[in-house]
């Protein structure tokens, strides 16, 4: 390794150079080294000789370059420049300088620097650096302004080209000049990065010093020696009395010898009595002395035995509960005792409170004498010994966190110190895998516990955050997750309680609450107020006084002072045991925490079975070409064996799965919970089979109920013959139908070749006798539990089919996450092999393996293979095919140069920009091994031109089908002069029974009229679009006429410009529809006459007979439901009944859509020969449309079911493919324009309809209105029926009426449009009592509006008539306009005869008269003159509904609409027609 020091403009940087890498130095933040104001970019790289260069200039120790502000100095250090020296052992000051007397002599230095205070570095962690003002000193690459600075252990110092690193035992030095020193050299090698496992820690076997537990019994003293209580006089007096009596007898009666005998005997008796007394007394005293001596010796031995036991107990306690200072040594030396306690140990979660007189671990048994009248000192001695060893004095007092909540009371700062001791003890002896801490504390107390952040136990790994809750944010961030964790543990205990199994939860959570206010309003309070020990959670409460503690606290510790504490209760029992807390003032708590933070605890040694193995590693290859797939296909034969590698039992120990019927197969189960590698093991097995067997020998049908994830991975694999995803009821039955069709096909082929097993067939195929490949078909369901739940009938049939298909080469592999309740007897009995990965619980493991082993698996991909009844039962690691495939064998290494800060929550927070430079490079996307192998197999398949196997399972109908994919759509190629029979290509049909998908074609002659029933939004309009364009593309506009009735949402409007379309109707165009009905009736009658005339039965026969072109008529109705309750319902339905009954022979065909079958009347519905059902919300409605169906209609837009013997399912075609550059309407317009431009013949006539607005000026020139006026008529508007010009003949009398004067004024305006022409032809006289013609008073010959003037007009009219009768017609005719006829009569009292003469004779003589008036006034008047005029006039314009007028008696019109503005009825010859006046 090389180190490079870069110095520029008082900036100092160091770079560790790695061989083969390149580096940049610039002022850009993304560079490897950033130097402000550098002004250039320096590239560092090695040349072919390994020499480091800066911009192609070699760095030979020192390279100086000119910079913008200062010289750029590059200093390169190598291994040869490294040295390490110990501090002086006696003095506390050393010097580094150029002088011979310096402790470390470096000639290149200009001035010396002083290093001091290194003797106390172990405690202080730093030394002091002293230098003069002329020397630049950098500490951690920052220039120091002070002359005395602290440098901590690990800090780097740079002085005049010399690099120093402060260590606890000395200095590491990098100098390109010789370093001379008498100091002890520590090492000659430059320290490199430590090995990967330098900080890994493995538990050593634990040494446990048990506390003595054998009972020690103090026996009672032996029974006291019984003292002879006989007094000496009792022995002496009887013989003395005898002597006395003998003497008396002798005195009374001397008897010589007898007396001597009696006296002798008595004397002897006295002597022996005295002797016996004193000997017995002596013996008693000796026995008493011996008893006391022996028992005291016994007590002395017992005392030693007890003392030894107490010492053993004290040693055990002191060993297992050392002082914090001793713990520091344990941690510092990385002693094997670290993390020695596990949840299975007796002292798990035990810690020391302090020093106290503790209870003995053994029982001292002594039975005190209950009652004794005489005091025995030996009993007192025994009792004294028993009472002396009541406690073990000055021994560690132990508390534990296993038996309910505990609480500390007292001064908070004292309690925090006790909690710190507890933290240190528990953290040192318990692994962070087994124990975690959570502190809920006040924010001002966090600083006190800040040192503990280094403890790995303070990180809650499940939440990836430090276990400190001290404000609202941390509370919400942590406690909610903890609440969920507690809830899950409680639920787990409840579930396991049924089986009486104990659960040990890991990690144990020590939940310390020093501030209840933070959780008082949180849901976790529910659990804090109960004992959570059973769930692996230890609660510790901190309060000032005992009264504030929760009631469920079991152990209470009172910290009275730094030297006194009291264990008040323990596990709810009063103990009141005082203890002395340990003093830890001189212990560096953070040092202990930091040392523990460096340890990576590895719980278990690595198993012989690898934790993971990639697919290619299992095959011992690096590149897919090395798999030798072609040779494997050539050599492997399925009828011999189907064994393929699946994983490894250990190094180079391959485990193979062989689904040959006589080995592990043919069917099996796979179980594994989420994340266990279940899908991956299936993928590896599929891939392994594909590598080893030819596509004609092995094929896969995947059922991926979760949504097609696995199916997508293998979509390019030639062995894949089908995928079944997201099955609903219909798709399930369709799939089953397809599989059964495949079985029938295989049975047929077996019969043709006289074999009964697939192995025999494969032999014939290899020999070339059989020509159609028939591979083993592996049906694999990735999540059959859900499939079985949703589609139980399908699952049952699938298992049954697989059982039947054993000899036909059908293999069924079922995979599930949770086998419990899913694997029934039928599935179990048909599954010879079982693969069990990690499952959720023991019940699941027992369900699939009949053992609980799989519940203990922890690694993804680790699995058990069980075949039969434990014929094979092996644990192995399955291969992983999702690994990145790098053909060059080098993993893409991207160095992340982001600098992260560990924030207060223990989480990483980026504090600089991303310096990786990836934003400037194109990210390389590597293939997975699975993708690489599939691509390799695909390339082999293409190269060898392997014929695809016929697929037993055709994919579900696509959601988009296009007409151009089904049939020719270029109208230029299809239009011809020859009349063709109509064929309709409706879409793509699906016939799983025949394993066929193809165009859905209807012969119109056979299909008849078509009714499509479906819910709105499922493609009904698209169905009509498809038919419209299909017809238009195959037939010229003169061969096919289309009438579009759009009763929906204007869906047919975009196609109205197709030249074949005669007209377009909407539901509110009642009049237009009425016209169409009349036209259809006329056309039916016309065609029927043709048939009758030529004596043929159909128009097609007529065409063949005559060669005439009579177009097909297509009536297309969208949303027939709208006909109901419409104003034209009755007439329209009657028309459609007639059309569907008679139209087919007349080449008039109806196609309609509706949302329900009963939208049509029964006679019409019966005539609809072809009925199609789309998706319907009411499922029963489908049966009404197509009858009993095998498959329901899927809830997919465009999916439909055709009524036929087999009820064929199909997907409706679309006229155009989706084009990103054009909208659908643009595509329609383009084709319509092309058709219009291409076709120059006749197109169908549309239905003439009244425009919304007709202005006189718009029609003046086109209809030549001035000439019409000049020829003696008034053009007034257009009629609604034929939209032709309507006029009032001035040569005949006429009457115009309306409902209001405003309409009369409008009529006057239209009548006077050509006033100049009228004046040329007529002498115009107007009697206008109501003033509507007032605007023209000066433009006519005579105008009267006053009563007298009106009378004058009357006289003029009579005189004019008389004069013309006498003289004949004048050169200029007269035109009399009588406005307000009623008032005219009232003013003039014109006789009836005059009225008759004016009407009958006037026109002949050139006197023309026009009556105008308000309809109601004309009707209500009782003037006979009006009645006469009405009866004699044959021209009327009535501005009122026919049903409301009373001039004529016409048949009542049902629901006649209200007359709109400018509308009227023209009545002539007892017939009427509706018109609209010009504007």
UniProtKB/Swiss-Prot annotation:
Residues that coordinate or bind ATP: 672-679, 1014-1021
This entry carries the following GO cellular component terms, namely: plasma membrane
Q: Which PROSITE patterns match?
A: FTSK (PS50901)
Query: Gene3D superfamilies under this entry?
Result: 2.60.200.20, P-loop containing nucleotide triphosphate hydrolases
Identify the Pfam families for this entry: FtsK_SpoIIIE, FtsK_SpoIIIE_N
Q: How does it sit in the membrane?
A: Multi-pass membrane protein
Q: Which residues lie on this side of the membrane: Extracellular?
A: 253-256
The UniProt keyword set, sorted, is:
ATP-binding, Cell membrane, Membrane, Nucleotide-binding, Repeat, Transmembrane, Transmembrane helix, Virulence
Q: Which residues lie on this side of the membrane: Cytoplasmic?
A: 1-229, 280-1479
Q: TM segments?
A: 230-252, 257-279
Disruption of the gene: reported phenotype: Loss of secretion of EsxA and EsxC but not their expression.
SUPFAM superfamilies, per the entry: P-loop containing nucleoside triphosphate hydrolases, SMAD/FHA domain
**Localization annotation:** Cell membrane
Keyword Transit peptide attached: no
Q: Where is this region: Required for substrate secretion, protein missing this segment is unstable?
A: 1-189
PANTHER family recorded: DNA TRANSLOCASE FTSK, SPORULATION PROTEIN RELATED
Q: Which family does it belong to?
A: Belongs to the EssC family.
Q: How does it assemble?
A: Homooligomer. Interacts with EsaE.
Q: What is this protein called?
A: Type VII secretion system protein EssC
Classification from the root reads: Bacteria, Bacillati, Bacillota, Bacilli, Bacillales
């Amino acid at each position: 390794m090389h180190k490079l020091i870069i110095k520029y403009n008082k900036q100092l940087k160091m770079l560790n150079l790695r061989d083969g890498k390149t580096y940049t130095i610039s002022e850009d933040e993304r560079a490897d080294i950033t130097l402000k104001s550098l002004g250039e970019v320096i590239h560092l790289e090695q040349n072919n000789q390994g020499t480091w260069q800066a911009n192609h200039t070699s760095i030979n120790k020192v390279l100086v370059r000119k910079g913008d502000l200062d010289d750029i100095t590059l200093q390169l250090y190598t291994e040869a420049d490294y040295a390490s020296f110990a501090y002086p052992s006696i003095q506390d000051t050393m010097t580094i300088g150029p002088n011979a007397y310096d402790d470390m002599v470096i000639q290149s230095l200009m001035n010396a620097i002083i290093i001091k205070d290194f003797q106390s570095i172990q405690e202080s962690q730093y030394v002091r650096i002293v230098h003069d003002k002329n020397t630049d000193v950098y500490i951690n690459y920052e220039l120091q302004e002070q002359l005395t600075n602290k440098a901590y252990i690990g800090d780097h110092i740079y002085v005049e080209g010399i690099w120093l690193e402060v260590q606890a035992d000395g200095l590491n030095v990098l100098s390109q000049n010789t370093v001379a020193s008498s100091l002890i050299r520590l090492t000659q090698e430059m320290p490199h990065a430590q090995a990967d496992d330098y900080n890994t820690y493995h538990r050593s076997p634990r040494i446990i010093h048990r506390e003595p537990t054998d009972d020690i019994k103090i026996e009672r003293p032996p029974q006291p020696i019984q003292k002879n209580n006989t007094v000496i006089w009792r022995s002496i007096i009887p013989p003395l009395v005898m002597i006395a009596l003998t003497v008396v007898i002798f005195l009374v009666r001397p008897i010589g010898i007898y007396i001597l005998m009696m006296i002798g005997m008595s004397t002897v008796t006295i002597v022996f009595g005295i002797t016996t007394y004193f000997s017995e007394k002596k013996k008693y005293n000796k026995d008493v002395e011996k008893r006391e001596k022996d028992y005291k010796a016994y007590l002395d031995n017992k005392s030693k035995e007890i003392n030894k036991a107490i010492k053993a107990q004290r040693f055990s306690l002191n060993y297992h509960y050392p002082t914090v200072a001793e713990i520091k040594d344990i941690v510092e030396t990385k002693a094997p005792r670290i993390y020695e306690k596990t949840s299975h140990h007796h002292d798990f979660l035990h810690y020391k409170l302090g020093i106290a007189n503790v209870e003995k671990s053994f029982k001292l048994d002594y039975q005190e004498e209950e009652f004794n009248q005489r005091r025995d000192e030996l009993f007192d001695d025994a009792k004294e010994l028993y009472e002396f060893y009541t406690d073990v004095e000055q021994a560690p007092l132990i508390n534990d966190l296993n038996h309910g909540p505990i609480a500390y009371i007292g001064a908070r700062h004292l309690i925090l110190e006790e909690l710190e001791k507890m933290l240190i003890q528990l953290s040192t002896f318990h692994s962070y895998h087994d124990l975690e801490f959570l502190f809920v504390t006040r924010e001002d107390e966090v600083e006190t516990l800040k040192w503990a952040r280094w403890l790995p136990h303070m990180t809650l790994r499940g939440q990836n955050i430090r276990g400190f809750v001290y404000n609202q944010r941390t509370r919400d961030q942590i406690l909610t997750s903890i609440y969920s964790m507690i809830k899950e543990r409680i639920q787990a205990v409840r579930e396991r309680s049924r089986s009486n199994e104990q659960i040990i939860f890991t990690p144990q959570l020590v939940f310390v609450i020093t501030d209840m206010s933070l959780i008082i309003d949180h849901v976790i309070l529910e659990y804090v107020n109960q004992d959570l020990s059973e769930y692996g959670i230890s609660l510790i409460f901190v309060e000032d006084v005992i009264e504030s503690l929760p009631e469920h606290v079991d152990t209470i510790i009172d910290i009275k002072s730094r030297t006194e504490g009291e264990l008040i209760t323990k596990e709810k029992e009063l103990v009141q045991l005082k203890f002395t807390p340990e003093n830890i003032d001189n212990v560096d708590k953070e040092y202990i925490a930091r040392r523990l933070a460096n340890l990576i605890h590895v719980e278990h040694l690595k198993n012989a079975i690898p934790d993971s193995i990639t697919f290619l590693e299992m095959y011992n290859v690096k590149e897919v070409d090395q798999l030798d797939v072609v040779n494997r296909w050539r050599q492997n034969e399925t009828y011999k064996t189907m064994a393929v590698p699946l994983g490894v039992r250990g190094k180079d120990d391959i485990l193979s799965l062989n689904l040959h019927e006589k080995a592990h197969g043919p069917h099996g189960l796979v179980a594994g919970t989420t994340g266990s590698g279940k899908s991956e093991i299936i993928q590896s097995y599929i891939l392994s089979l594909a590598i080893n067997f030819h596509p004609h020998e092995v094929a896969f049908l995947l059922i991926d109920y979760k949504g097609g994830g696995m199916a997508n991975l293998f979509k390019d694999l030639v062995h894949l013959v089908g995928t079944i995803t997201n099955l609903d009821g219909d798709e399930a039955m369709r799939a089953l139908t397809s599989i059964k069709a495949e079985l029938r096909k295989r049975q047929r082929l077996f019969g043709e070749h006289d074999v009964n097993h697939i192995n025999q067939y494969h032999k014939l195929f290899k020999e070339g006798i059989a020509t159609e490949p028939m591979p083993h078909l592996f049906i694999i369901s990735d999540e059959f539990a859900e499939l079985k739940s949703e589609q139980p009938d399908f699952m049952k049939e699938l298992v049954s089919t697989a059982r039947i298909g054993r000899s036909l080469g059908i293999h069924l592999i079922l995979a599930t996450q949770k086998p419990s309740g899913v694997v029934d007897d039928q599935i179990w009995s048909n599954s010879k092999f079982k693969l069990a990965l990690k499952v959720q619980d023991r019940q699941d493991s027992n369900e699939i393996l009949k053992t609980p082993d799989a519940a203990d698996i922890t690694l993804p991909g680790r699995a058990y293979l069980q075949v039969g009844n434990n014929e094979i039962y092996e644990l192995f690691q399955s291969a992983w095919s999702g690994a990145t495939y790098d053909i060059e064998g080098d993993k893409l290494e991207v160095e992340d140069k982001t600098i992260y800060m560990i924030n207060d929550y223990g989480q990483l927070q980026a504090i600089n920009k991303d310096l990786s430079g990836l934003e400037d490079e194109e990210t390389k996307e590597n293939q997975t091994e699975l993708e690489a192998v599939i691509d390799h197999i695909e390339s082999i398949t293409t190269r060898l031109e392997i014929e695809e196997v016929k697929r037993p399972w055709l994919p579900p109908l696509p959601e988009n089908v296009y007409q151009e994919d089904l049939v020719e759509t270029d109208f230029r190629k299809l239009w011809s002069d020859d009349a063709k029979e109509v064929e309709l290509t409706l879409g793509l049909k699906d016939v799983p029974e025949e394993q066929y998908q193809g165009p859905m074609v209807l012969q119109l002659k056979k299909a008849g009229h078509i009714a499509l029933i479906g819910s709105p939004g499922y493609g009904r309009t698209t169905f009509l679009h498809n038919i419209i364009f299909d017809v238009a593309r195959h037939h010229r506009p003169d061969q096919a006429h289309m009438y579009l009735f759009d009763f929906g949402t204007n869906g047919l409007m975009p196609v109205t410009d197709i030249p074949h379309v005669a007209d377009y109707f909407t539901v509110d165009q009642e009049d237009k529809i009425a016209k169409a009905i009349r036209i259809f009736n006329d056309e039916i009658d016309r065609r029927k006459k043709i048939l009758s005339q030529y004596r043929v039965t159909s128009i097609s026969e007529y065409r063949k007979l005559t060669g005439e072109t009579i177009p097909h008529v297509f009536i297309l109705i969208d949303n027939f439901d709208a006909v109901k309750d419409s104003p034209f319902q009755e007439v329209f339905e009657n028309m459609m009944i007639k059309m569907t009954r008679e139209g087919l022979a007349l080449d008039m065909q109806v196609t309609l859509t509706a949302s329900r079958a009963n939208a049509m009347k029964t006679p019409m519905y019966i005539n609809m020969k072809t009925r199609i059902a789309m998706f319907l919300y009411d499922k029963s409605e489908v049966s009404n449309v197509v009858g009993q169906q095998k498959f329901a209609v899927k809830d997919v837009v465009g999916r439909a079911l055709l009524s036929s013997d087999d009820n064929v399912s199909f997907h409706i075609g679309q006229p155009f493919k989706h084009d990103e550059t054009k909208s659908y309407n643009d595509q329609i317009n383009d084709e319509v324009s092309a058709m219009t431009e291409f076709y120059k013949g006749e197109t169908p006539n549309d239905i003439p309809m009244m425009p919304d607005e007709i202005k006189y000026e718009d029609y003046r020139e086109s209809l030549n209105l001035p000439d019409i006026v000049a020829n003696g008529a008034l053009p007034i508007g257009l009629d609604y029926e034929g939209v032709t010009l309507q006029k009032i003949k001035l040569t005949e009398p006429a009457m115009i009426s309306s409902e209001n004067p405003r309409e009369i004024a409008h009529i006057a305006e239209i009548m006077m449009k050509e006033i100049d022409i009228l004046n040329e032809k007529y002498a115009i006289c107007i009697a206008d009592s109501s003033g509507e013609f007032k605007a023209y008073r000066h433009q006519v010959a005579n105008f009267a509006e006053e009563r007298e003037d009106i009378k004058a007009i009357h006289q003029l009219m009579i005189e004019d008539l008389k004069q013309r009768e006498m003289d004949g017609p004048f050169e200029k005719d007269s035109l009399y306009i009588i406005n307000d006829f009623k008032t005219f009569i009232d003013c003039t009292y014109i006789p009836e005869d005059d009225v008759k003469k004016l009407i009958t004779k006037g026109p002949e003589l050139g006197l023309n008269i026009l009556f105008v008036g308000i309809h109601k006034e004309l009707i209500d008047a009782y003037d006979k003159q009006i009645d006469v005029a009405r009866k004699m006039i044959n021209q009327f314009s009535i501005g009122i509904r026919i049903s409301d007028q009373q001039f004529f008696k016409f048949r009542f019109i049902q629901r006649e609409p209200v007359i709109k503005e400018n509308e009227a009825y023209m009545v002539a010859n007892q017939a009427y027609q509706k018109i609209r006046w010009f504007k």
